[in-house]
From Swiss-Prot:
The RNAP catalytic core consists of 2 alpha, 1 beta, 1 beta' and 1 omega subunit. When a sigma factor is associated with the core the holoenzyme is formed, which can initiate transcription. One of its GO terms (molecular function) is DNA-directed RNA polymerase activity. The gene is rpoB. This is DNA-directed RNA polymerase subunit beta. One of its GO terms (biological process) is DNA-templated transcription. It catalyses: RNA(n) + a ribonucleoside 5'-triphosphate = RNA(n+1) + diphosphate. InterPro entries: DNA-dir_RNA_pol_bsu_ext_1_sf, DNA-dir_RNA_pol_bsu_external_1, DNA-dir_RNA_pol_su2, DNA-dir_RNAP_su2_dom, DNA-dir_RNAP_su2_hyb_sf, RNA_pol_bsu_bac, RNA_pol_bsu_CS, RNA_pol_bsu_protrusion. It comes from Legionella pneumophila subsp. pneumophila (strain Philadelphia 1 / ATCC 33152 / DSM 7513).
């Protein structure tokens, strides 16, 4: 029985090997789970752990709520949604991968059918009948613990999308539309779902509207359609100037500010004093306006000419007769003024406009508006949306209403409403999902304000205007699409409900829903085949945000601005990691600490600063919230109390970098690495690398192939452990306890008592993944790093996966590198390696190929998998068993048979001789042809696994049965171990209850009244302990309970075994016409060789040019030969100096390890070793290691693990300084300049100058020469041109193109050219002839007509021109 101890400071794996950190700052908050963006999004979509009453209106729940209730056309029946629940998945993740299934759970929705009494006259009609039922709505794919989906047996990732946020956006065309370069402003209302609404200015300053990017209409048509008259429109958009006719003079109500900038057309006097303020012809300035305000002028007498040309704000009507003298927006003319005077109209209302900041845009637009009423406006919009259809009043009204004002068709969403309200200045963040009249007006007003110079346009690339759409949201949208299709079908069937007694199940067909989901996960642009080369590539793939995809950008249309790094990317999106090539800047990676908020905007954490003092309180800020804050960097100097010491602090404010005083600072960055992504945070000395090279380094780490023996980097950044544990490739303890049993394929843990809840088993069994194929054919293999009896805590690493070493990410190998030229073999980034690397299998990788053989039911009969194959010798069948399937462990090469299969041939007419042979020998071989699965060309390896899938109902062959038996044995083994531990636990409690108690009787020599001793219990069989009778009734009852527990345990184990057995032995659901599938897995060992691509972590990539014998490599004075020689010219021009610093620090790390090894070999005391380790780990830096918490054994284990070198961590932007590297080199007794005298291995002479030598972490990338090299003799040809196909996959030839032909022509190599164009390419007759000739040993060729020439002739004839060749 395991009992928990206090939580230790370090994990089990960490204690075995500490990493010395050079970080100057302590991280204030732990790095959030790297896969949280995926896991949280899908968790919110499913809401499986939430009660129905507490479910939020998101995900599945929101999709159902938005479509239901569904009413019939007559309104007499409706379907209501009550709730849903997800069942258990039929197979676990591992089974789904093996069987090629989708890991999903059945979705059952509780639907209520309400039938109303249609004959009743009441309104609302009374309910006649209610029927409730659980309806199956298809399977919903489940997310695995590591954020992936298993679809048809392959792991996929749904990448998050960065798209334009719904809301309103104001922009201008940057002067590109019109030749004058005038800025044309526009506004666009983007809904989450529905039609786009654009408002735009044209070069003549009229305002237009477009719906869904169709033909533009004057904006006043839209306003009229909303019910506004010309007067209303003008009063909304313009200030009014009132003019009164008094005593034959025109007086205007004076607002002095409105005159500013105008040229006075008459003298302006102060009425009381007659003082002249402005002379005629002078421009009115701010000084003049001040004078007017000072003299408190209320009105201004203006000459009649001043009014001519002004625009009316209201209709002018003679009240006595009702006669219209002028319409609103008409210009005032001489005639109009006369008519008004004649009709006794004394007041004129004019709109106020000027050229500076009160443009007459809406007035001008009204002038070109052809419509005069709401109906005409609606008809005009109808004509634009539905050209060619005759409009009716009802159709026009319905169309316009459905565009923006109906929830089913239009939805701004919560985000869109929030963004909209904030942009147009509405105080609340909430509101309706559809548009209102006021919304449209406020957008037009804001647009006109911007045109008038008030306010700014928006920046589309600002992360406040782009939001992340994650898996959950995309799946919900897809689900809603499926439900809407269901709704249409259900509506039609609902009318039958009244006549027939139907249940909800009969009405709903779930096919459209499951088809929509299947389509999304199977073929959406954002549902991608998971990048599984190594753990880092998996993590990065899940943290990717893409601007491409449905509803996003396209590569061709994306300009430079969208791709560029934006100031708001700081701490949210990595400025370094993005692909090279056409997708640059469109696909990004989230920064280490970034997360998305409820609206989908990316947030980054900041420490709160109050009055110049930094607190430990952390707040997440989105790009919108960050704008007005002053945010300091994380490396600001602080005193012990957290006060900022500097007088001026560099900070970010209004998206700019500036210096400011400490009292203004509101926030401070959490960590220096918060601006970069996971991959970039793994590059040591990133701050010394050029950004372009850092980009390549980030991308190439993702292509590193897992080596046979992973080796941790000597120089890391401290992120390695986090990436390895979050990636899900290593096995992490779910609960603490003691290791009970370990072997290569599983770990059994006896869980601590206080970590088990009632009804839970106190045993955790971890089955390890052994030699499993990844999506990229690399090998996924886990190996335990714990031993029996070890005490572990929750979260400890129990087993290393691919590319992990003691729970740390380990993508490559530490190699002794020298920067020097070597006989031209490292020209142009080539790399020279030592034979020792090959010999020690440092970069040997295992690749697993999956080969599949399918037996089908054909027209001529069934294909059969068998070892009885016609015309094949015994030796070719030596690796097959009696079922015709290859043995596990067989070493095979190209052309070997893996699975024997025969296919029936068509019946052919037999010759008399064949008939005789068949009669004598019963020969049936001619009926079938050999269609066995063979090893493809260029491949050889070892068979490591075979899977046989048989169609349900067919008899299984011997091999399939033996595979099943193995599987059952594994299940049985797990159950036996679990049962053993749980039984021991129960018997331990029984013995605890019985010891020293007085017995009244029992088996064996137990006399009544005697005490029960341990000796007695040891002699009696454990099963009979329950027969001992005891005086104490309470204890007797407890014993009885424990006895029942044992019985229940036995039953539970039997049930679990039977369930597993049923699953294992059931037939497989194969595609139609498929009888049997055999999958063979080959492990291919690839050693490193010339042509393979290698790289460091700083973008320093190259191809191996030669493998040099160890004795020829340059070596140091102590005889140590270097492993790899790089060209020093690869450093200065590339500006990635990080690799040089890494080399120096790597040398120090290795030297320190050597000194520790020396101390261990000299058998020095633990105290002496501890003192030396203290010097290494704790003589500087903030992030110290507490060695006091280790006992002597742990200390010696640690020291032993440090023999190969002391791992160092130099966090990005907070790494080791030059001085610190030098002090480490001195501590290891190495030269402080990191240079060493090298001796040429071939001559034995010293090189002229000392050379930079040290340890660099090198990766082998997934660009292997074995996969790329290819040669062809004869093969398949293109159908039309008869030329050989191209590419390795088609077993194609090399293209001899136009330029190559010129080269041969230039050399006059006529015969070579002739054979290139004829017998080696598309001269069909000639190539068969030469093949025969070569076989016969005759090397002559007889060229004929190339087939492509015949194609050309046929094309010319198709044009009606007849060409015939004349033969001499």
């Amino acid at each position: 029985m395991a009992v928990a101890e206090a939580k230790p400071q370090y994990s089990h794996a960490e204690k075995k090997r500490f990493r010395k950190s050079f970080g100057k700052q302590t991280d204030i908050m732990p790095i959030p789970n790297l896969l949280e963006i995926q896991l949280k999004s899908y968790r919110d979509f499913l809401q499986t752990d939430t009660k129905l009453s507490e479910q939020l209106n998101t995900g599945l729940h929101a999709a159902f709520s938005s479509v239901f209730p569904i009413e019939s056309f007559s309104g007499n029946a409706r379907l209501e949604y009550v709730g849903y629940k997800l069942g258990e998945p039929a197979f676990d993740v591992r089974e789904c991968k093996l069987r090629g299934l989708t890991y999903s759970a059945p979705l059952r929705v509780k639907i209520r059918l309400v039938v109303l009494d249609k004959d009743a006259s009441d309104d609302p009609k009374p309910i006649k009948d209610i029927r409730e039922q659980d309806v199956f709505m298809g399977e919903i794919p489940l997310m695995t613990d590591v954020g992936t989906f298993v679809v048809n047996g392959t792991e996929r990732v749904v990448v998050s999308q960065l798209h334009r946020s719904p809301g309103v956006i104001f922009e201008h065309d940057k002067g590109k539309t019109h030749s004058s370069g005038k800025l044309l402003y526009s506004a666009r209302i983007i809904p989450y779902r529905g039609s786009w609404l654009d408002f735009e200015f044209d070069p003549k300053d009229c305002v237009y509207v477009r719906i869904d990017r169709r033909r533009k209409l004057p904006v006043t048509i839209l306003l009229r359609a909303l019910g506004y008259e010309a007067e209303d429109i003008l009063s909304e958009f313009f200030e009014t100037t009132h003019c009164h006719l008094k005593n034959g003079e025109y007086h205007i109500d004076l607002i002095p500010q409105r005159l500013r900038g105008e040229i006075a057309s008459f003298d302006i006097h102060v009425p009381e004093t007659g003082e002249l303020i402005v002379e005629q012809g002078r421009r009115i300035t701010a000084r003049h306006i001040k004078q007017m305000e000072k003299s408190q002028m209320q009105d201004l007498v203006v000459p009649r000419d001043y009014l001519i040309g002004k625009t009316l704000a209201k209709n002018i009507i003679d009240t006595s007769t009702g006669e219209f003298l002028a319409q609103a927006n008409d210009e005032i003319t001489e005639e109009l003024l006369d008519a008004m005077a004649n009709h006794g109209i004394l007041q004129i209302d004019m709109i106020y406009t000027n050229d500076l900041d009160h443009g007459s845009y809406i007035s001008d637009t009204l002038k070109i508006d052809p419509t005069g009423s709401q109906l005409e406006a609606l008809v005009e919009i109808y004509r634009m949306m539905r050209p060619g259809e005759p409009p009716t009043k009802e159709a026009a009204e319905a169309l316009f209403k459905n565009l923006f004002f109906v929830e089913e068709r239009y939805d701004l969403s919560a985000v869109g409403r929030m963004k909209f309200n904030r942009r147009v200045g509405i105080k609340s963040d909430e509101g309706p999902g559809t548009l209102t009249k006021e919304d449209i007006l406020s957008v037009i007003k804001t647009l006109i304000d911007i045109r008038n110079g008030i306010g700014m346009v928006d920046d589309i690339d600002h992360l406040g205007n782009r939001r992340v759409r994650s898996v959950g949201e995309m799946t919900e949208n897809q689900f809603r699409v499926g439900l809407v299709r269901v709704e249409r079908a259900v509506k039609e069937r609902l009318s039958l409900v009244e006549s027939e007694n139907l249940m909800p199940q009969d009405l709903i067909n779930a096919k459209p829903v499951s088809a929509a989901i299947k389509e999304f996960f199977g073929s959406s642009q954002l549902s991608q085949f998971m990048d599984q080369v190594n753990p880092l590539s998996g993590v990065t793939h899940k943290r990717r945000v893409s601007a491409l995809g449905p509803g996003g950008l396209t590569r061709e249309r994306a300009g430079f601005e969208v791709r560029d790094v934006h100031t708001t990317h700081y701490g949210r999106v990595c400025p370094i990691e993005t692909p090279e090539g056409p997708n640059i800047g469109l696909i990004n990676s989230l920064s280490v600490y970034a997360r998305t908020n409820e609206y989908g905007f990316i947030e980054t954490p900041c420490r709160k600063v109050v009055n110049g003092r930094v607190t430990d309180e952390v707040e997440y800020l989105s790009a919108i919230e960050e704008v007005d804050q002053y945010i300091a960097q994380s490396n600001v100097e602080l005193d012990a109390q957290g006060n900022i010491l500097a007088d001026l602090v560099p900070c970010r404010h209004q998206n700019e970098f500036s210096l400011t005083t400490p009292d203004k600072i509101n926030y401070m960055d959490v960590s220096p690495k918060q601006i970069v992504s996971v991959a970039a945070s793994l590059i040591p000395f990133l701050e010394h690398d050029d950004a372009n090279r850092a980009l390549m380094g980030s991308n190439m780490q993702r292509q590193a192939v897992p080596t046979l023996r992973s080796e941790k980097p000597l120089v890391g950044t401290g992120m390695e452990r986090i990436v390895a544990s979050d990636s899900g490739v290593s096995v992490v303890a779910k609960r603490g306890g003691v290791i009970d049993l370990v072997d290569a394929s599983r770990i059994v843990v006896r869980v601590n008592d206080d970590e088990t809840t009632a009804g839970e088993t106190g045993v955790d069994i971890y089955n390890l993944t052994k030699y499993f194929r990844s999506n990229q054919d690399t090998c996924i293999n886990q190996r335990p790093i714990v031993s029996t009896g070890d005490r572990i805590q929750r979260g400890d690493v129990l087993a290393d996966g691919p590319c992990t070493d003691m729970g740390e990410l380990a993508l490559g190998q530490n190699l002794l590198v020298a920067f020097m030229p070597w006989n031209g073999y490292n020209f142009e980034d080539s790399i020279l390696i030592s034979e020792r690397i090959v010999h020690d299998d440092r970069f040997t990788t295992i690749h697993i190929e999956e080969l599949t053989c399918i037996a089908r039911d054909t027209k001529l009969g069934t294909e059969e998998i068998t070892a009885d194959i016609p015309n094949v010798g015994e030796s070719a069948l030596s690796n097959l068993d009696e079922s015709g399937v290859v043995y596990i462990g067989a070493e095979v090469k190209a052309g070997d048979i893996l699975v024997g299969k025969v296919t029936p041939k068509g019946e052919t007419q037999l010759t008399p001789e064949e008939k005789l042979l068949r009669a004598i020998f019963g020969e049936k071989a001619s009926d079938v042809k050999d269609s066995s699965l063979r090893v493809p060309s260029g491949m050889n390896g070892t068979v490591i696994d075979v899977q046989v899938f048989t169609r349900d109902g067919l008899e299984k062959d011997a091999r399939a049965k033996s595979i099943e038996e193995e599987h059952l044995a594994r299940v049985r083994k797990d159950l036996i171990d679990e049962r053993r531990i749980r039984e021991e636990d129960i018997y331990h409690r029984v013995s605890h209850l019985l010891l020293d108690k007085v017995a009244t009787g029992g088996p064996g020599s137990l006399k009544p009244g005697s005490k029960i001793t341990q000796d007695y219990l040891d002699k009696v069989e454990r099963e009979k302990w329950f027969d001992i009778r005891i005086e104490d009734d309470a204890i007797s009852q407890q014993l009885e309970q424990l006895s029942k527990q044992l019985e229940l345990l036995t039953k539970e184990m039997e049930k679990r075994f039977n369930d597993s057995r049923k699953k294992i032995i059931q037939g497989d659901d194969l595609a139609p016409g498929v009888l049997k599938i055999v999958k063979v897995y080959l492990a291919v060992k690839r050693r490193i060789q010339p042509g393979d691509k290698m790289a460091g972590r700083h973008g320093n990539k190259g191809v191996i040019s030669i493998v040099v014998p160890v004795e020829d490599m340059p070596h140091m004075e102590d005889g140590t030969a270097v492993d790899i020689v790089l060209n020093p010219l690869g450093v200065p021009s590339r500006m990635n100096i990080g690799q040089v610093l890494e080399t120096h620090l790597g040398l120090a790390a290795k030297g320190l390890g050597r000194k520790i090894a020396q101390m261990l070999d000299e058998k020095q005391t633990p105290e002496a070793i501890k003192a030396y380790l203290e010097k290494i780990y704790n003589h500087d830096g903030v992030q110290r290691v507490n060695l006091k918490c280790l006992n002597d054994d742990e200390l010696m284990t640690l020291a032993d693990n440090l023999r190969a070198g002391v791992p160092m961590a130099t966090p990005v932007f907070d790494g080791a300084t030059e001085q610190e590297i030098k002090s480490m080199l001195q501590l290891a007794d190495l030269p402080a300049d990191g240079k060493t005298v090298l001796i040429d291995g071939r001559t034995g002479n010293k090189f002229d100058n000392p050379v930079t030598v040290g340890y660099m972490y090198m990766l082998k990338l997934n660009h292997l020469v074995d996969d790329k090299m290819h040669a062809r003799s004869t093969g398949s040809y293109s159908l039309v041109t008869q030329q050989p196909l191209g590419g390795k996959a088609q077993f194609g030839g090399q293209r001899f193109g136009e330029m190559e032909v010129w080269a041969l022509e230039a050399y006059g190599a006529a015969y070579t050219l002739q054979e290139m164009l004829t017998v080696k390419s598309d001269d069909v007759g000639g190539r068969t002839k030469i093949y025969k000739n070569i076989v016969d040993g005759d090397h002559r060729m007889d060229p004929g007509m190339p087939e492509s020439f015949n194609v050309l002739l046929k094309e010319i004839r198709a044009l009606g021109i007849d060409i015939e060749l004349e033969h001499d």
